[in-house]
Amino acid sequence: MKQSVSAEQIELKSSLPGSKKVYVDGTREGMKVPMREIEQSDTNGVQNPPIRVYDTSGPYTDPEYKVELEKGLQAPRHSWTLGRGDVEAYEGREIKPEDDGVKVASKHTPVFPQMDRKPLRAKQGANVSQMHYARNGIITSEMEYVAIREGVEPEFVRKEIAEGRAILPANINHPEAEPMIIGRNFHVKVNANIGNSAVSSSIAEEVEKMTWATRWGADTIMDLSTGKNIHTTREWIIRNAPVPVGTVPIYQALEKVNGIAEDLTWEVYRDTLIEQAEQGVDYFTIHAGVLLRYIPITAKRMTGIVSRGGSIMAQWCLFHHKENFLYTHFEEICEIMKQYDVSFSLGDGLRPGSIADANDEAQFSELETLGELTKIAWKHDVQVMIEGPGHVPMHLIKENMEKELDICQGAPFYTLGPLTTDIAPGYDHITSAIGAAMIGWFGTAMLCYVTPKEHLGLPNKDDVREGVITYKIAAHAADLAKGHKTAHQRDDALSKARFEFRWRDQFNLSLDPERAMEYHDETLPAEGAKTAHFCSMCGPKFCSMRISHDIREYAKENDLETTEAIEKGMKEKAVEFKETGSHLYQ
């Protein structure tokens, strides 16, 4: 009897406090774009309008939706894909025990029930990538959906994709995903890495991490599983993921050859790409820029090659003394990608793993190759983003962004941090968020989160929450710095609520309402404290905002401007000082 994963096995979260799921109708039939609407209380009888924010949580936070993990999410994009008339269903490759890293399938592995689903691919001679449509002047349903989410015109979305400045990762076999866009002229996005390892985690835990990450604001998920049940874990995640899912296919390919890098072949890797494309993976990290001639340059580094995918390919190249087969077969990879609309995330296999190695010859040599590969992918109308570092001190961060834009012709940059110092294990979500905010401001389109467990262990769901929130802060700070037209609205609303002592509105407007309320209630748990004009930091007599209110009230009572009120009050105090004998201490 095959086991299953059910909603009862994981902790599912409802909508955040003070929020409700709302939908904006598109022009296309059945198109409903989700938003999160945050209610606000009145100020002295004057209504404060609700604030609508971008929502990545999927149907899990819709009270009308019944979660059935074994059935997967609904698939609204399926009809859009079929409606274009350029795809066909086919049998697909046979799923084998080796796909899960075993020789014989285990009865204890919870296989996803809907295994009779037929994958889609482009018809002979067709190209189903969003870039191909965009370059042919077509505004797809996915582009309109994204435009509503971002608050821009659909034509702007089409043009950014056509020019290669943005990608819309949307594999035709992942119809459950709600379309989103990654590009420097849109909201800065956040990716959350999940996935098992050889020593930790189960399928249920990884599905739970996915739902947690998207609830807290992850725009995409990467399944970086390296343990057993790789295929099955990915199937459960994709079928239940409302956001795009990325992978590093070389990890699974390595499992298929028993973890021996030198036994990897193009045929094994190609088979893995097709397997994952049929499942619905939206973007592949492919380390095609790790060339044989670059590997010796890393020998003088402090920390060598720190990318798992990069080190695997380097080991293969050195053993065979041949060029990286991902590079030599790159055009063939493009042919696969455009059949399913899988986007490239060109991997930075030679990224710096320490401050000492930042911006070195190996890193920027690989970047030059990624620029070359970007042009090849674009020749096939395949969408591309570029992965970036890594460990970079603050004064060297801007150079990374400038070089990427120049060398890779403006393709979206997707960076891991970067970490700005190496001395804070346990706090690397903070060291990296500093760099993430900076590089997001300079133009990075998506930030890959770092959790407190970075360099220490596999993150659990609480670490995922911590990492996502930390990176949402960095991404939002970057949006503010870039002058995104709607970014300041939530800040202004929260600041107004703070000044007016609307405590619940403060909590609800924050990125993590539950944490904000928890910290407030540690010292002032009573319900009356939710309307008090002070908190436990300053108390009632030293609250600067309460004093500001007193000044304004004084000005109002005396028919004065606030500055005049302060001057008048100072004069009154001066007279009082003289009348009491001009003594400093009584």
UniProtKB/Swiss-Prot annotation:
Residues 22-39 have a biased composition (Basic and acidic residues). It comes from the Bacteria. Pfam families: ThiC-associated, ThiC_Rad_SAM. Binds 1 [4Fe-4S] cluster per subunit. The cluster is coordinated with 3 cysteines and an exchangeable S-adenosyl-L-methionine. Residues 1-58 are annotated as: Disordered. GO terms for molecular function: 4 iron, 4 sulfur cluster binding; carbon-carbon lyase activity; zinc ion binding. Its EC number is 4.1.99.17. The keyword Iron-sulfur applies. Substrate binds at residues 193, 222, 251, 287, 307-309, 348-351, 387, 414. InterPro entries: ThiC (IPR037509), ThiC-associated_dom (IPR025747), ThiC/Bza_core_dom (IPR038521), ThiC/BzaA/B (IPR002817). Zn(2+) binds at residues 391, 455. Belongs to the ThiC family. HAMAP family: ThiC. This is Phosphomethylpyrimidine synthase. The lineage of its organism: Bacteria, Bacillati, Bacillota, Bacilli, Bacillales.
